[in-house]
Curated annotation (Swiss-Prot):
Protein name: E3 ubiquitin-protein ligase PDZRN3
Biological role stated in the UniProt entry: E3 ubiquitin-protein ligase. Plays an important role in regulating the surface level of MUSK on myotubes. Mediates the ubiquitination of MUSK, promoting its endocytosis and lysosomal degradation. Might contribute to terminal myogenic differentiation.
Taxon lineage: Eukaryota, Metazoa, Chordata, Craniata, Vertebrata
Broad class of enzyme this protein falls into: transferase
E.C. designation(s): 2.3.2.27
PTM characteristics: Auto-ubiquitinated.
Domain PDZ: 248-338, 418-502
Species for this entry: Rattus norvegicus (Rat)
Gene designation per UniProt: Pdzrn3
């Protein structure tokens, strides 16, 4: 509606008037025909009539009306009187300023704000009325007891009735409460309707999203299947882990259907480009259909022909038409991919040399590895191998090999393959059983342990047991939860798996077929080797005695080149340490040794890594049995025993003389059994068993004789030191005799199947699988008990980055190497160094190869005896560790008597002088000898404890442990692990609760006792007891004081202490 005309000051232009209300236009709107009306007048008209009020045209809607802004601004500038002019306001303002004036006009009507008054007044009079004239204004409170406020009218009337006033007040409050409840119900109803509306919208959006996702998932699945098939057929290089074979199948229609779908085909008929490799592929097979029967089609098969019609370059429509018009029986020729069988690779591709540390080789390790030989000399020929696996082992010059060693080490040892699996519905199973670690290790690998024969994965044929899953559907698998979630997802029907496997992985069938034959042959050969090595040790001892009588000196500088370091309990921690300390002197010693003995240069052999990475050892045709050396009572060995050994050795030599390769390959008794009488085999087995018992008796005799000899040598050494100082004299006898103390090794537990050792930073210079050990410790005694010439030349065998494979040995025992310029080593120093080397055992990086390689014939290390061990398995520590354990059980019982003697010998060696001689190195590389205090008894006991706890495992063993390299635990074993873990957790909780209760009792009994430093540190230790490492503030004194003690003083917690002496 418009503004009244009489409110405006002056005349108003008629064009500014509305034709409907005849007032001044308010919010003018114009019609398409050009007429202008007030918005409040024309909108109801148009909605009701549907035409212009002037009747000038046909139909009209409200959407066709438009605002006239220039006309509106013109009207707003007109002068108008105040709306309260009748009440006395005489203001005249612009129409656009009228709302602002009305808000503060003094003549606007307003009511009194006192309850019960409600009188209508002018805005300017309201304040005065409420203050002075209103009868409802409060003047105080009732003093009669109700406490309600009194109004001016009630006070003027003489008071009020308290009961009536309280009833009125209560009624007012109840009315207000009812109004609030009603408003609350309205708001709740309004909120409920709004919530339902929002939920309906959200459900509709989710439904639409699901439908869209299903549509795109279906398209994506189809496109992915097609892309996978095309990429495998077109882009895949030949020989990439698979091979294709052609099959001819016969199909019969069932109710007019063949039961499979096809995809692919040439894009168009006109495209005759020969380079196009598009083909027809099977994308889906209906369950229980004709194509799904045994011997039928499989997914990803490429169809080549149908009833003689070539479909290799046909379009999709042509392929469909060919199947529709084909007459039964339908003969289909397809191409199917199958996994390529891994064959042997040349030795040049697999000859790798790793570096690592070998520690604590005990008798059980030695006896366990008697069934594992070392590489053979370069006399090639088949030996105990089937014809389908030819033996081709090439040998190269060490210098040529070392030139490419780094490239070989950088070569990738795993091959990756992407496998796509498609399932028809969510109920279909992939058929994969995975295994993983169950402890708190961060690096958890997911491996395939089992494949269901009738599953999708088995039909695909590209996934094998032992493969590691790297990615699933493009997502890198970090832990077992992600792998399980991705593999068990019901939404995905298409799975893309990126798997990894070793390049040299072989089929297990070959190993299973020939394993028993190999083990039988190897067992017989190892028994013979034990006899040979025992006889060599006996002969070397006799020959050494003779050499001592002849007199000779040893180059102590050469002997000590590898012995100048103090035993730290953990071995060297870096390869650079070894290079910095002893590279120059050792190289010079090697050159001098090689030049002084022409035979040594002719016997330089190389190593082959295809059998456990062990190095070849020099072979000498010289006889170790000398008829001249008849003083067999030197170490308490009876003469009849020695004669029996000689007879047995002659018998073995006669047996081996029948083989054309007898110099390098000892003949197997089983081969002889095939040609001769089986009774001779049984007789020889009895002789070999008697040999083992004789060897054990020999070791016990050596121990007893060594104890007696050691006492004599100690007195003689002290006398010679007192009288002759550092003058040159024969030290080779003392050095050799004290090297017999290697029999003092500690026993090792046979159930060591843990996957890691203490990570104390041991060096990594030898392959973890390279164990240069013999059936018993006599092998090491042969190396140390030999003449000084061989000992001095043993420096050439010490592995170095520049000469890992070259071996320079001088087996001559009649020509001692004498260096008059070098400082001689006195007996006490030689004793101490030898004892340190022996106490360090095979923990020293160079102890095992050096001590075990002096006179062992190289034909004892034929790689063909290990044919039952796959080439790829030689890189896995867990595989070899299991083989060692299996072999160790067979010899564990026979070695217990030796172990007990070792403990006695260790106790006898504990009484050492308080001073010892040390070999130091100057800045120019020369060595000198000085006196240093002996380490404290506590440190020695701790070192022995560390040696027991390490038990032959190294940091390399930890890096290549069973779990990380994929040992597969069965379900029963995993259940046992869980039970053990729960039991340990329960014990830890019980111990924790016991300790807390004890601490609470102590605090309650002695609240005001001031805690000393020991109690504080002990409390800190208790918090850390379940952790494998300690914090940065833990001191050795705290560990030694109470590191393994409970609050009551008893030894309860088994915390390990690893100390490195620098």
């Amino acid at each position: 509606m418009g503004f009244e005309l009489d409110r405006f000051d002056g005349e108003v232009d008629p064009d500014l008037k509305c034709a409907l209300c005849h007032k001044v236009l308010e919010d003018p709107l114009t019609t398409p025909c050009g007429h202008v009306f007030c918005a409040g007048c024309v909108l109801p008209w148009v909605v009701q009539e549907g035409s212009c009020p002037s009747r000038c045209r046909g139909r009209l809607s409200a959407k066709e009306l438009n605002h006239v802004l220039p006309l509106k601004r013109l009207i707003l500038k007109l002068d108008i009187k105040c709306a309260h002019a009748a009440r006395g306001c005489g203001r005249v303002v612009k129409l656009q300023d009228l709302p602002e004036h009305l808000e503060r006009c003094d003549f606007a009507p307003a009511r009194c704000r006192h309850a019960g008054c409600g009188q209508l007044l002018l805005r300017r009079d309201v304040e005065a009325h409420m203050r002075d004239a209103c009868d409802a204004r409060p003047v105080g409170r009732c003093q009669e007891g109700c406490g309600l406020p009194l109004t001016h009218g009630e006070q003027r009337a003489g008071g009020h009735c308290c009961a009536r006033a309280l009833r009125a007040h209560n009624g007012a409050l109840q009315a207000r409460l009812g109004a609030l409840h009603k408003a609350l119900k309205k708001e709740a109803l309004r909120a409920g309707k709004r919530e339902k509306s929002l939920l309906a919208q959200l459900a509709a959006a989710q439904l639409e999203l699901q439908m869209t996702a299903l549509r795109y998932q279906k398209k994506f699945t189809e496109y992915s299947a097609r892309l996978d098939s095309l990429s495998r057929c077109v882009a895949a290089p030949p020989g990439g882990g698979e091979e294709t074979k052609s099959l001819t199948l016969v199909l019969h229609r069932d109710s007019g259907s063949l039961g499979f779908n096809i995809i692919g085909g040439r894009p168009c008929v006109d495209n005759q480009d020969g380079s196009s490799s598009e083909g027809i592929f099977v994308s889906k097979i209906v369950d229980s259909g004709p194509a799904a029967k045994e011997g039928g089609l499989q997914i990803h098969d490429r169809i080549i022909e149908v009833n003689g019609k070539d479909l290799s370059r046909a379009t999709h429509d042509q392929a469909v038409e060919a199947f529709k018009t084909a007459k039964e029986p339908i003969v289909v020729q397809v191409l199917r991919r199958t996994p390529r069988t891994k064959m042997f690779t040349p030795a040049s591709e697999s000859q790798l040399v790793d570096t690592g540390t070998q520690t604590d080789i005990t008798f059980e390790h030695i006896m366990a590895l008697t069934k594992i030989s070392s590489p053979s000399p370069p006399v090639l020929g088949p030996y105990l191998l089937p014809e389908e696996h030819p033996s081709s082992h090439e040998y190269y010059d060490p210098n040529d090999y070392m030139g490419d060693i780094h490239q070989d080490m950088d070569r990738e040892e795993l091959e990756l393959e992407e496998v796509g699996l498609y399932r028809m519905n969510s109920q279909d199973k992939l058929g994969l059983t995975v295994c993983y670690r169950t402890d708190d290790e961060d690096d958890i690998g997911i491996y395939i342990s089992e494949i269901d024969p009738n599953s999708i994965a088995a039909k695909d044929g590209r996934i094998r047991e032992g493969d590691r899953i790297i990615q699933i559907n493009g997502i890198e698998v970090q832990n077992r939860e992600e792998a399980v979630a991705l593999l068990t997802s019901e939404e995905n029907k298409n799975f893309s798996l990126l798997i990894a496997r070793p390049e040299l992985q072989l089929d297990e069938g070959w190993m299973d077929d020939d394993r028993n034959d190999f083990l039988d042959d190897l067992h017989m050969d190892m028994l013979e080797e034990q006899h040979h090595q025992a006889m060599q040790f006996t002969a070397s001892v006799l020959q050494q005695k003779k050499h001592e009588e002849d007199g000779g000196t040893t180059d102590t500088a050469t002997i000590l080149s590898n012995q100048h370091e103090k035993d730290s309990g953990v071995g060297r921690t870096d390869e650079s340490t070894r290079n910095d300390e002893s590279s120059e002197q050792e190289n010079n010693g090697e050159d001098a040794t090689a030049s002084s003995n022409p035979l040594a240069g002719q016997r330089k052999l190389t190593c082959s890594q295809d059998t456990l990475g062990s190095g070849d050892l020099p072979f000498s045709n010289e006889s170790f049995i000398s008829a001249d050396c008849t003083d067999v009572d030197y170490l308490g060995i009876p003469e009849d025993e020695c004669e029996r050994f000689r007879e047995l050795l002659e018998l073995k030599c006669q047996v081996q003389s029948t083989s054309p390769y007898s110099l390098y390959y000892p003949s197997s008794p089983l081969d002889a059994a095939g040609k001769g009488d089986p009774e001779s085999v049984d007789k020889e087995l009895e002789l070999l068993n008697e040999e083992l018992r004789s060897i054990e008796l020999e070791c016990l005799s050596i121990v007893r004789a060594h104890k007696m000899q050691q006492l004599k040598e100690q007195y003689r050494e002290s006398w010679m030191l007192h009288h002759s100082g550092f003058r040159n004299y024969n030290t080779s006898v003392d050095v050799r005799r004290h090297e017999l103390s290697d029999i003092t090794e500690l026993p090792e537990k046979s159930d060591k199947d843990s996957s890691s050792a203490y990570n104390t930073g041991e060096s990594c210079r030898s392959t973890p699988l390279t164990l240069e050990i013999s059936p018993d410790n006599s092998l090491r005694r042969v190396a140390e008990g030999s003449s000084e010439g061989a000992t001095a030349n043993m420096e050439a065998y010490r592995p170095s980055p520049k000469n890992l494979l070259a071996i320079t040995e001088d087996p001559e025992v009649s020509t001692p190497n004498y260096n008059p310029g070098a400082k001689e080593l006195d007996p006490s120093q030689a004793l101490e160094i030898k004892e340190r080397r022996v106490s360090d055992g095979s923990r020293s990086p160079t102890a095992s190869p050096k001590l075990g390689s002096a006179y062992l014939p190289s034909y004892h290390h034929s790689p063909y005896k290990h044919a039952h061990i796959p080439a790829h398995a030689q890189h896995y520590q867990s595989y070899m560790h299991l083989i060692q354990q299996k072999s160790a059980v067979e010899y564990a019982q026979s070695q217990m008597s030796l172990v007990s003697m070792c403990k006695d010998l260790n106790s006898s060696n504990s009484a050492e002088p308080r001073m010892e001689w040390k070999v130091k190195i100057r800045s120019d590389g020369t060595r000198y000898i000085t006196k240093r205090p002996v380490r404290d008894r506590l440190l020695r006991e701790r070192a022995l404890k560390i040696r027991e706890e390490r038990s032959g495992l190294t940091t390399d063993d930890d890096a290549m442990s069973e779990m990380k390299m994929g040992r597969y635990w069965s379900k029963e074993e995993r259940k046992q692990h869980l039970v053990k873990a729960k039991e340990q957790r329960r014990r830890r909780e019980f111990m924790m609760q016991s300790r807390l209760d004890c601490l609470k009792e102590q605090q309650a009994s002695d609240d005001r006792k001031e805690m000393n430093i020991l109690e504080l540190s002990h409390k800190k230790m208790m918090k850390k007891r379940n952790k494998k490492i300690f914090d940065n503030w833990m001191t050795i004194q705290e560990l030694l004081t109470h590191g393994t003690k409970s609050p009551d003083g008893t030894r309860v917690y088994n915390s390990f202490l690893s100390v490195t002496t620098v």
